[in-house]
Amino acid sequence: MTEAAEEPAPPTIGVDLGATNVRGGVVDRSGSILAELRDHTGDDGADVIPTTAALVGRLRTDFPAVAAVGVGAAGLVDRDGDVQYAPNIPAFRRTPLREELGNAIGLPVVVDNDANAAAWGEIVHGAARGALYALMVTLGSGIGGGIVARGRVIRGAHGFAAEVGHFQIDPNGPMCACGEPGHWEAFASGHALGRMGREWAAAGRAPGVLARAGGDVEAVTGVHVGDSAQGGEADGRALLDEYAELVAVGLAGLANILDPERIVISGGLVELGDTLLAPVRAAFARRIEGSAYRPRIDIVPAALGEQAGVIGAAARARDLEPGESGVWTK
């Protein structure tokens, strides 16, 4: 008698919820995205839940067997799936996102911090796969983080761990978007690189970068700096090297505390490849304690790119047992 073939696990939907955009995808057990949609939300985030519910509904039209939905949301997400605070989404203040979205779509929903979701995606399907202890750092408009130890995302007592962009490295430094001065995010985010580019251009130190912005100092962004550095222009390279030092300051501090075996860097700046990562690795080696006497900590680019959050959130949803509420306990 031949045993019946085991039915494939139903797909899940992963949602990456940002300040002004929502992206969702149907993801199978292998981490492949079968369908993907995105939509815009209002600046204040008041329409995030109905917009997300509508997007999930459109995805389910072609994939009615979807079993659950995972959401990676910006901000402080607690164990109940409530977003307590999101600095870039004014409407997210003590918002019961898991409950309200679940009621709107009629499926089990699990909600996690967006950086944690991306970290989980890289652990399960990406560049951190096989690492027992890993640190995920996202260099975007801000800086996000995820910590993995022995195959589990570390969330802390309240779910707010790994807000790595918000440790202070200079109390007299530039103002962070959260309203406090001198946070690592204010020095080493993608927005910070753009600010550095404008400062250098205004001081006459970055003519190549300025030319790429059409000669308009206020138009200079991190993209112009990266293009200049990749083009071999001395000013772009020097500026990016200084930025790499600031990235390494934070990475070395985190590594001294957490002792990961691998650090995965994600975000748009990773597209610069070794133009950015080589000076980051060199500066990191100079700054971490006992560099010559400790095992090497690999610093690698993320493998999943901007899809890490969707894939990781879907993987979190796949871990839900039938009938489980979506409140995470590990």
Q: Where do the language-model regions lie?
A:
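ATP-binding/phosphotransfer module of carbohydrate and carboxylate kinases, centering on a glycine-rich
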Residues: 1-68, 78-80, 98-107, 121-131, ...
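Short beta-strand scaffold segments in enzyme catalytic cores
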Residues: 22-26, 75-76, 143-148
